[in-house]
Amino acid sequence: MWPLLLAVALSTLLPLAMPGSAGAVRIKDIATFSGVRDNQLVGYGLVVGLGGTGDKKESVFTVSSMVNMLERMGVAVDPKQLKPKNVASVMVTARMPVSAKPGARLDVTVSSMGDATSLLGGVLLQTPLKGVDGKIYGLAQGSLALGGFSAEGQAARAQKNITTVGLIPGGAIIERGVPFEFNQQDRLTLNLSTADFSTAQQVAERLNAAMGGRYANAVDASTVAMDVPPNYRGNLVPLMASVENIEVAPDAPARVVVDEKTGTVVLGRDVRISRVAVAHGSLQVTVQESQQVSQPAPFSQGQTVVTPQTNVNVREENRRLMMIEGATLQELVDGLNAIGATPRDLISILRAMKAAGALHAELEVI
């Protein structure tokens, strides 16, 4: 009876999980299940085997770490005699999925924290990886893989990409898992990546339609709670696999995002502009500095005088008013392109439109 009920429930969910209208996305692409997330791990370690590109003697924490490591191995050393040029202190980071079990492997990122110039050819020594609770969840060790190189001589240096950050694929072994009673839940929570009341309500309605009952409800703009149907109690994987593939058409407020540092302008799909007349002319000011040298006449006992000379040139384009109106994104783009403005000019135009009340969208500057 149980397999029959499960098959019937899945057959109800599958049609609603098939591709829908244009603009629809899967729930898994805009939301995550509460509790199903990665955990950050971090550790401090030493990378050895560097060809003279490690930390300098001024990195006292590297020297101290080397002394402590050697003493634990039964080797007595004088800190003043250590030269850590082949060793670098590093921070090791990794992301552990909530479902990771002891024995599983994780990729780790190794980043220099001293004044080492390159980690090329280095080997990370055994490094405990701790969670936010201070407990050890894994151990990392292995040879580093870098995406660049660095070579230098006495008068020149060549470098490609960053050489102070490396990766060890599968370099960490999980020693302790995160306790999580996954299948014992009676209620699931979906967290939307972008808060929006319309999207949250739409997700709840799609879930209820898929499960054939009132199981889901929108708690707020970014949270949808769902009771687990009796057919899936103790076996949530089929339910969650079907839920995350249901498609919805996410909604969002109209927004214009501009980045003045790079001159990037991004217009959302629902951005609209009321009828407005725009005239935009660029003002260019050119300042040229030169030195004027005045030489005295021969045998006049005069002195050579150097005086600065400045030439300022101002040019302003004379452009006519143009009418712009955009009921759709394509019309808006065509109207703005007709002005012939550069992306940086467009930022000023959009700001002026917003101040005039013609731009019906949120203007965000990053």
From Swiss-Prot:
Q: Which residues form the signal peptide?
A: 1-24
Q: Domain of life here?
A: Bacteria
| Biological process, per Gene Ontology | bacterial-type flagellum-dependent cell motility
Q: Name one GO molecular function term.
A: structural molecule activity
Q: Which UniProt keywords apply?
A: Bacterial flagellum, Periplasm, Signal
Keyword tRNA-binding on this protein?
no
| Hydrolase in keyword set | no
One GO location term (cellular component) = bacterial-type flagellum basal body, distal rod, P ring
Q: Where does the record say this protein resides?
A: Periplasm; Bacterial flagellum basal body
Which residues pair up as cystines? none
Q: What does this protein do?
A: Assembles around the rod to form the L-ring and probably protects the motor/basal body from shearing forces during rotation.
What the record says about family reads: Belongs to the FlgI family.
* Subunit details: The basal body constitutes a major portion of the flagellar organelle and consists of four rings (L,P,S, and M) mounted on a central rod.
Kindly provide the name given to this protein in its UniProt entry.
Flagellar P-ring protein
What is the native source organism of this protein? Nitratidesulfovibrio vulgaris (strain ATCC 29579 / DSM 644 / CCUG 34227 / NCIMB 8303 / VKM B-1760 / Hildenborough) (Desulfovibrio vulgaris)
